[in-house]
Amino acid sequence: MQNITQSWFVQGMIKATTDAWLKGWDERNGGNLTLRLDDADIAPYHDNFHQQPRYIPLSQPMPLLANTPFIVTGSGKFFRNVQLDPAANLGIVKVDSDGAGYHILWGLTNEAVPTSELPAHFLSHCERIKATNGKDRVIMHCHATNLIALTYVLENDTAVFTRQLWEGSTECLVVFPDGVGILPWMVPGTDEIGQATAQEMQKHSLMLWPFHGVFGSGPTLDETFGLIDTAEKSAQILVKVYSMGGMKQTISREELIALGQRFGVTPLASALAL
Protein backbone atom coordinates (compact mmCIF):
# COMPACT_ATOMS: atom_id res chain seq x y z
CA MET A 1 0.00 0.00 0.00
CA GLN A 2 1.33 3.42 -0.95
CA ASN A 3 1.43 5.95 1.87
CA ILE A 4 -0.53 9.05 0.93
CA THR A 5 1.58 11.24 3.22
CA GLN A 6 4.45 10.70 0.77
CA SER A 7 2.40 11.86 -2.23
CA TRP A 8 3.44 15.00 -4.08
CA PHE A 9 0.31 16.85 -3.00
CA VAL A 10 0.56 16.10 0.74
CA GLN A 11 4.27 16.90 0.70
CA GLY A 12 3.54 20.09 -1.24
CA MET A 13 0.96 21.18 1.32
CA ILE A 14 3.39 20.45 4.14
CA LYS A 15 6.06 22.61 2.51
CA ALA A 16 3.71 25.48 1.66
CA THR A 17 2.13 25.64 5.13
CA THR A 18 5.49 25.33 6.88
CA ASP A 19 7.06 28.03 4.71
CA ALA A 20 4.10 30.35 5.30
CA TRP A 21 4.33 29.86 9.06
CA LEU A 22 8.08 30.51 8.99
CA LYS A 23 7.38 33.73 7.07
CA GLY A 24 5.14 34.86 9.93
CA TRP A 25 2.04 34.90 7.75
CA ASP A 26 0.02 32.28 9.61
CA GLU A 27 -0.07 32.73 13.35
CA ARG A 28 -2.17 30.31 15.42
CA ASN A 29 -4.91 28.97 13.11
CA GLY A 30 -4.63 31.90 10.71
CA GLY A 31 -4.63 31.16 7.00
CA ASN A 32 -5.98 28.39 4.79
CA LEU A 33 -4.91 26.60 1.63
CA THR A 34 -6.70 24.48 -0.98
CA LEU A 35 -5.34 22.62 -4.00
CA ARG A 36 -7.56 21.23 -6.76
CA LEU A 37 -6.57 17.70 -7.73
CA ASP A 38 -7.53 15.17 -10.40
CA ASP A 39 -8.88 11.68 -9.80
CA ALA A 40 -5.62 10.31 -11.19
CA ASP A 41 -3.71 12.05 -8.38
CA ILE A 42 -5.59 10.25 -5.62
CA ALA A 43 -6.28 6.92 -7.37
CA PRO A 44 -3.12 5.16 -6.08
CA TYR A 45 -4.08 5.94 -2.48
CA HIS A 46 -7.62 4.56 -2.13
CA ASP A 47 -6.40 2.10 0.50
CA ASN A 48 -5.60 5.12 2.72
CA PHE A 49 -9.15 6.51 2.55
CA HIS A 50 -11.69 6.44 5.38
CA GLN A 51 -13.95 3.39 5.22
CA GLN A 52 -17.01 5.56 5.83
CA PRO A 53 -16.27 9.07 4.51
CA ARG A 54 -18.21 11.82 6.25
CA TYR A 55 -20.50 13.91 4.06
CA ILE A 56 -20.87 17.68 4.55
CA PRO A 57 -23.35 19.74 2.51
CA LEU A 58 -22.26 23.04 0.99
CA SER A 59 -24.15 26.22 1.82
CA GLN A 60 -24.74 26.68 -1.91
CA PRO A 61 -24.37 24.21 -4.79
CA MET A 62 -21.24 24.45 -6.94
CA PRO A 63 -21.91 22.26 -9.98
CA LEU A 64 -18.72 23.45 -11.72
CA LEU A 65 -16.75 21.56 -9.05
CA ALA A 66 -18.81 18.35 -9.27
CA ASN A 67 -16.75 15.16 -8.81
CA THR A 68 -13.60 17.21 -8.15
CA PRO A 69 -11.14 16.26 -5.38
CA PHE A 70 -9.26 18.84 -3.32
CA ILE A 71 -6.69 18.75 -0.55
CA VAL A 72 -7.50 21.37 2.07
CA THR A 73 -6.35 22.67 5.44
CA GLY A 74 -8.61 22.11 8.43
CA SER A 75 -10.70 24.51 10.47
CA GLY A 76 -8.95 25.68 13.61
CA LYS A 77 -5.72 23.98 12.57
CA PHE A 78 -2.29 25.58 12.98
CA PHE A 79 -0.04 25.73 9.89
CA ARG A 80 2.95 25.06 12.13
CA ASN A 81 1.49 21.65 13.03
CA VAL A 82 0.81 20.37 9.51
CA GLN A 83 4.34 19.00 9.21
CA LEU A 84 3.95 17.18 12.55
CA ASP A 85 0.63 15.45 11.80
CA PRO A 86 -0.61 15.86 8.23
CA ALA A 87 -3.65 13.61 8.70
CA ALA A 88 -4.94 15.69 11.62
CA ASN A 89 -4.47 19.05 9.91
CA LEU A 90 -5.14 18.33 6.24
CA GLY A 91 -7.93 16.55 4.43
CA ILE A 92 -8.79 15.27 0.98
CA VAL A 93 -12.38 16.03 0.06
CA LYS A 94 -14.32 15.22 -3.09
CA VAL A 95 -17.31 17.22 -4.24
CA ASP A 96 -20.31 15.03 -5.07
CA SER A 97 -21.85 14.54 -8.51
CA ASP A 98 -24.21 17.52 -8.29
CA GLY A 99 -21.92 19.93 -6.43
CA ALA A 100 -24.20 20.05 -3.39
CA GLY A 101 -21.66 18.82 -0.85
CA TYR A 102 -18.50 16.81 -0.38
CA HIS A 103 -17.12 13.67 1.27
CA ILE A 104 -14.00 13.71 3.44
CA LEU A 105 -11.98 10.88 1.91
CA TRP A 106 -8.80 11.16 3.97
CA GLY A 107 -7.41 13.12 6.91
CA LEU A 108 -9.20 15.63 9.15
CA THR A 109 -9.15 13.04 11.89
CA ASN A 110 -11.09 13.30 15.16
CA GLU A 111 -14.14 14.81 13.45
CA ALA A 112 -12.23 17.84 12.15
CA VAL A 113 -13.72 19.77 9.22
CA PRO A 114 -12.23 21.85 6.39
CA THR A 115 -11.33 25.51 6.79
CA SER A 116 -14.18 27.89 7.58
CA GLU A 117 -13.16 29.82 4.46
CA LEU A 118 -14.03 26.86 2.23
CA PRO A 119 -16.97 28.77 0.65
CA ALA A 120 -14.60 31.58 -0.37
CA HIS A 121 -12.08 29.05 -1.67
CA PHE A 122 -14.58 27.02 -3.69
CA LEU A 123 -16.24 30.11 -5.17
CA SER A 124 -12.81 31.50 -6.09
CA HIS A 125 -11.77 28.17 -7.60
CA CYS A 126 -14.87 28.34 -9.82
CA GLU A 127 -13.96 31.80 -11.07
CA ARG A 128 -10.27 31.06 -11.57
CA ILE A 129 -11.11 27.88 -13.50
CA LYS A 130 -13.15 30.02 -15.89
CA ALA A 131 -10.66 32.90 -16.00
CA THR A 132 -7.63 30.69 -16.71
CA ASN A 133 -9.25 27.82 -18.66
CA GLY A 134 -8.56 25.48 -15.78
CA LYS A 135 -4.90 26.42 -15.33
CA ASP A 136 -5.18 27.79 -11.79
CA ARG A 137 -5.48 25.09 -9.14
CA VAL A 138 -4.49 26.75 -5.86
CA ILE A 139 -6.17 29.25 -3.56
CA MET A 140 -4.10 30.50 -0.61
CA HIS A 141 -5.18 32.84 2.16
CA CYS A 142 -2.69 34.19 4.69
CA HIS A 143 -1.96 37.15 6.94
CA ALA A 144 1.01 38.71 5.13
CA THR A 145 2.21 41.32 7.62
CA ASN A 146 3.28 44.24 5.46
CA LEU A 147 0.42 43.96 2.99
CA ILE A 148 -1.99 44.17 5.91
CA ALA A 149 -0.08 47.16 7.32
CA LEU A 150 -0.43 49.04 4.04
CA THR A 151 -4.23 48.69 4.12
CA TYR A 152 -4.20 51.07 7.11
CA VAL A 153 -2.26 53.84 5.34
CA LEU A 154 -2.93 53.55 1.60
CA GLU A 155 -6.23 54.32 -0.07
CA ASN A 156 -7.96 50.96 -0.37
CA ASP A 157 -8.42 51.26 -4.11
CA THR A 158 -7.29 48.66 -6.64
CA ALA A 159 -5.53 51.11 -8.95
CA VAL A 160 -3.77 53.01 -6.14
CA PHE A 161 -2.65 49.91 -4.27
CA THR A 162 -1.50 48.15 -7.43
CA ARG A 163 0.52 51.13 -8.63
CA GLN A 164 2.29 51.48 -5.28
CA LEU A 165 3.23 47.79 -5.23
CA TRP A 166 4.46 47.96 -8.83
CA GLU A 167 6.68 50.89 -7.89
CA GLY A 168 7.86 49.18 -4.71
CA SER A 169 9.65 46.40 -6.58
CA THR A 170 10.43 46.06 -10.29
CA GLU A 171 9.33 42.42 -10.60
CA CYS A 172 5.80 43.11 -9.32
CA LEU A 173 4.34 44.31 -12.62
CA VAL A 174 5.70 41.19 -14.29
CA VAL A 175 4.35 38.84 -11.61
CA PHE A 176 0.90 40.40 -11.20
CA PRO A 177 0.17 42.66 -14.18
CA ASP A 178 -3.56 42.17 -13.50
CA GLY A 179 -3.16 44.13 -10.28
CA VAL A 180 -4.46 43.59 -6.76
CA GLY A 181 -8.18 43.51 -6.08
CA ILE A 182 -9.41 45.01 -2.79
CA LEU A 183 -12.64 44.52 -0.87
CA PRO A 184 -14.12 46.61 1.92
CA TRP A 185 -13.72 45.02 5.36
CA MET A 186 -16.13 42.09 5.69
CA VAL A 187 -16.83 39.39 8.27
CA PRO A 188 -14.66 36.36 7.39
CA GLY A 189 -15.96 32.82 6.96
CA THR A 190 -19.24 33.90 5.32
CA ASP A 191 -20.79 33.32 1.91
CA GLU A 192 -20.87 37.10 1.47
CA ILE A 193 -17.10 37.55 1.63
CA GLY A 194 -16.70 34.42 -0.48
CA GLN A 195 -18.94 35.81 -3.22
CA ALA A 196 -17.28 39.23 -3.16
CA THR A 197 -13.81 37.66 -3.32
CA ALA A 198 -14.77 35.38 -6.18
CA GLN A 199 -16.17 38.31 -8.14
CA GLU A 200 -12.83 40.12 -7.90
CA MET A 201 -10.99 36.88 -8.69
CA GLN A 202 -12.56 37.05 -12.14
CA LYS A 203 -10.13 39.91 -12.80
CA HIS A 204 -7.24 39.49 -10.35
CA SER A 205 -5.08 36.59 -9.16
CA LEU A 206 -4.31 38.52 -5.96
CA MET A 207 -6.86 39.95 -3.53
CA LEU A 208 -6.57 41.99 -0.34
CA TRP A 209 -8.95 41.82 2.58
CA PRO A 210 -8.18 45.11 4.40
CA PHE A 211 -6.99 44.80 8.01
CA HIS A 212 -7.07 41.01 7.61
CA GLY A 213 -5.02 39.35 4.90
CA VAL A 214 -4.48 38.33 1.30
CA PHE A 215 -5.99 35.80 -1.11
CA GLY A 216 -3.87 34.47 -3.96
CA SER A 217 -4.43 32.09 -6.86
CA GLY A 218 -2.08 30.23 -9.15
CA PRO A 219 -1.45 27.04 -11.13
CA THR A 220 0.82 25.46 -8.51
CA LEU A 221 1.61 25.76 -4.83
CA ASP A 222 5.00 27.30 -5.66
CA GLU A 223 3.53 29.85 -8.08
CA THR A 224 0.82 30.90 -5.64
CA PHE A 225 3.24 31.18 -2.73
CA GLY A 226 5.62 33.13 -4.96
CA LEU A 227 2.86 35.52 -6.02
CA ILE A 228 2.06 36.44 -2.43
CA ASP A 229 5.74 36.49 -1.46
CA THR A 230 6.52 38.96 -4.27
CA ALA A 231 3.71 41.32 -3.27
CA GLU A 232 4.66 41.05 0.40
CA LYS A 233 8.31 41.87 -0.40
CA SER A 234 7.22 45.03 -2.21
CA ALA A 235 4.96 45.92 0.73
CA GLN A 236 7.89 45.46 3.11
CA ILE A 237 9.99 47.83 0.99
CA LEU A 238 7.16 50.37 0.90
CA VAL A 239 6.74 50.25 4.68
CA LYS A 240 10.44 51.08 5.02
CA VAL A 241 10.25 53.82 2.38
CA TYR A 242 7.24 55.48 4.00
CA SER A 243 8.93 55.31 7.41
CA MET A 244 11.97 57.10 5.93
CA GLY A 245 9.90 60.01 4.67
CA GLY A 246 8.43 58.67 1.44
CA MET A 247 9.60 58.32 -2.16
CA LYS A 248 11.93 60.90 -3.66
CA GLN A 249 12.14 59.01 -6.94
CA THR A 250 10.40 55.94 -8.32
CA ILE A 251 9.65 53.89 -11.44
CA SER A 252 7.87 56.12 -13.97
CA ARG A 253 4.80 55.31 -16.04
CA GLU A 254 6.96 55.14 -19.16
CA GLU A 255 9.31 52.71 -17.46
CA LEU A 256 6.40 50.53 -16.31
CA ILE A 257 5.10 50.45 -19.90
CA ALA A 258 8.55 49.44 -21.15
CA LEU A 259 8.73 46.73 -18.48
CA GLY A 260 5.40 45.27 -19.58
CA GLN A 261 6.48 45.30 -23.22
CA ARG A 262 9.77 43.58 -22.42
CA PHE A 263 8.06 40.71 -20.58
CA GLY A 264 4.97 40.47 -22.76
CA VAL A 265 2.37 41.36 -20.13
CA THR A 266 -0.47 43.87 -20.21
CA PRO A 267 -0.51 46.05 -17.08
CA LEU A 268 -3.81 46.93 -15.41
CA ALA A 269 -4.85 50.10 -17.26
CA SER A 270 -6.33 51.94 -14.28
CA ALA A 271 -3.11 51.53 -12.28
CA LEU A 272 -0.93 52.56 -15.20
CA ALA A 273 -3.00 55.70 -15.75
CA LEU A 274 -2.28 57.17 -12.29
From Swiss-Prot:
It is found in: Cytoplasm. It is an enzyme of class 4 (lyase). Binds 1 zinc ion per subunit. Belongs to the aldolase class II family. RhaD subfamily. The gene is rhaD. Its main location: cytoplasm. GO terms for biological process: pentose catabolic process; rhamnose catabolic process. It catalyses: L-rhamnulose 1-phosphate = (S)-lactaldehyde + dihydroxyacetone phosphate. It comes from Escherichia coli O6:H1 (strain CFT073 / ATCC 700928 / UPEC). Pathway: Carbohydrate degradation; L-rhamnose degradation; glycerone phosphate from L-rhamnose: step 3/3. InterPro entries: Aldolase_class_II_sugar_metab (IPR050197), Aldolase_II/adducin_N (IPR001303), Aldolase_II/adducin_N_sf (IPR036409), Rhamnulose-1-P_Aldolase (IPR013447). This is Rhamnulose-1-phosphate aldolase. Homotetramer. One of its GO terms (molecular function) is metal ion binding.
